[in-house]
Amino acid sequence: MYADESMIKIKHEVLYEVAKLAWAGELEAKRDNIAVELIPGPQAKFRCCIYKEREIIRQRVRLAEGKSAGPVDDGNVIQVISSACEDCPISSYTVTENCQNCLGKACINACKFGAIEPGRTRSHIDSTKCKECGKCAQACPYNAIAHLQRPCKASCPVDAISYNEYGITVIDEEKCIRCGKCIHSCPFGAIGSKTFIVSVIEAIKAGKHVYAMAAPATEGQFGADITMASWKKAMKELGFEDFYDVGLGGDMTAAYEAQEWAEAYKEGKKKVTSCCPAFVNMVRKHYPELADCVSTTVSPMCAVSRLIKARDPEACLLYTSDAADDLTRVD
C-alpha cells in the first residue's frame, strides 16, 4: 500500500497535466511536452535513464486519454505499461540460505521430476525441469525453499496474467475480470487503467449536459474535510450539470434485489448479486454454470444512470469510482 502511494502520485501528475492542456485546448499541440516537463533530467529519478522514464510517462498519457498504453488495443480498461514492466527475474521455487545441505535430502526425494540437485553448500532447483508442484517446499524440514511469484501474477484471482517471450506481463482478456488487483500489486506501477478525463472535458466545453456520479467509497479518497456536499459544489463549478451519490442507486437496487431473491427462495433457486462488475465477470467467464443465478437487477450505477436519463434525455453520464471494475464510460 505504501508503494502504491508513489504510483498514485505519478498518475495524478499525469492526469493533472493532461486535464490542464485539454481545458486550454492545447493537448494536441503540447502532448509530447508532458514527458519532458515531468521528467526534466538530466538525472533519472526511478529508472535507469530519463528516456525510459519519459516513455513511461508517454504511455501513461495515452491511458489518461482513454487509449491503450501501447499500439494495440484489446478493449480492456486494464492495461500493461510495457515500458514500466521490469521483467522481474523471479524463479517460482527457490532454495534460500536457510538450506542446511542436510543428509536426508528430503527435497530431492520429494521431487518427481529430477529438478533438484545437491550443491556444495545448498540444493539447487533447475527451473527448466521444475513443474512448480511445491512438493519440495512441503518436504523441507527447514522451510528453506521459498515460493516466489511476480506480485502481479500472485495477486490475480483468476490466473489471467502471463508473460511474453521478453518477460513482459501480458493480461489475458478472456480470463481478466477487471478487478484491478494487479494495478495495486505491481511495485513498478507497470499496470494501469484507462480514464476518460479528456472526453469529459470536451463534452463540458461543448456545452453538453454532463452529469457526474460517484460511488460512496470515493468520498474517503480526498480526506476527512471533503464531503459529498463539497464535492458536488466543486463539480458544478467545473461545469457539470449536477452530481449524484450512487449510494442512492444502492438503496434502489437493494429493494428490487431483495424482492427477486425472495421469489427465488420460494422456488428453491439460488441467487448471487449483480452489484459488483468484477464478480459478475468472474461468474460469466469462470463459472458459466452459475450465470443463471446472477440477479437480473441492474447495478446501483445503472439505476442512477436510468434515473438521470429519465429526467434529462440529453444527459451525458460520467461515473467515478475507486474500483477498477467500475471504470466504464456511460454514454
Where in this protein do the model-derived segments appear?
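An alpha-beta-alpha
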Residues: 314-315
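Conserved small/polar residues in nucleotide/adenosyl-binding loops
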Residues: 319-326
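Conserved beta-strand segments that form the floor/walls of ligand-binding pockets within enzyme
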Residues: 94, 213, 319
